[in-house]
């Protein structure tokens, strides 16, 4: 079993590209290599050691095109994630998984009606899952919707 790290190595978007509203001058975007603390896992969460993460047009939109993110920078982009669960929910430890790009709350009336794709409280790594995204070596995520790769 993999050793649980104290820190997550990550590439964080600290400044998206933009334009100064007063001068019109272009503001260059910044990605910075950082180390952030591994948070204490809550019940029902898993820590995934990232094997790979795709670069999606959504990530490019956040960085280059001014598309707003729910969590304001600094944050780690990346939501097309695969990896191995190393801690947390015992059903998944040691399993290779795909982390869904969007995770519903599974508790609201919309989810309970089977329409979790329409959930108003959904979370997305690299946007609305706090500062955590797939462009890192580990990511804490809700375990409930992980997809085991066989």
Task: Label every PLM stretch briefly.
Residues 6, 32, 42, 93, ...:
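A generic structural signal for well-ordered coil/turn residues at beta-strand boundaries
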Residues 1:
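Short, Arg/Lys-rich segments that mark the N-terminal edge of DNA/RNA- and chromatin-recognition modules
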Residues 12-40, 57-87, 96, 119-132:
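N-terminal glycine-rich cofactor-binding segment
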Residues 37-53, 66-112, 145, 150:
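Glycine-rich beta-strand-centered segment in the early N-terminal region that forms part
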Residues 11, 61, 98, 140, ...:
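Residues in well-ordered beta-strands of folded domains
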Residues 105-150:
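NAD(P)H dinucleotide-binding glycine-rich loop of Rossmann-like/cofactor-binding domains
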Residues 4-11:
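Short structural boundary motif marking the start of a folded domain
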């Amino acid at each position: 079993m993999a050793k649980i790290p104290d820190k997550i190595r990550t590439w964080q978007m600290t400044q998206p590209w933009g334009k100064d509203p007063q001068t019109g001058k272009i503001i260059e975007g910044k990605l910075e290599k950082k180390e952030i603390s591994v948070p204490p896992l809550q019940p029902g969460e898993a820590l995934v050691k990232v094997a790979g993460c795709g670069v999606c047009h959504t990530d490019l939109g956040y960085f280059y095109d001014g598309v707003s993110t729910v969590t304001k920078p600094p944050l780690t982009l990346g939501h097309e994630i695969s990896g191995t669960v190393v801690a947390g929910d015992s059903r998944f430890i040691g399993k290779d998984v795909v982390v869904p790009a969007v995770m519903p709350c599974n508790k609201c009336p919309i989810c309970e009606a089977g329409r979790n794709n329409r959930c108003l409280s959904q979370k997305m790594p690299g946007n609305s899952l706090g500062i955590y995204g797939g462009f890192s070596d580990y990511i804490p995520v809700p375990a409930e919707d992980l997809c085991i790769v066989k």
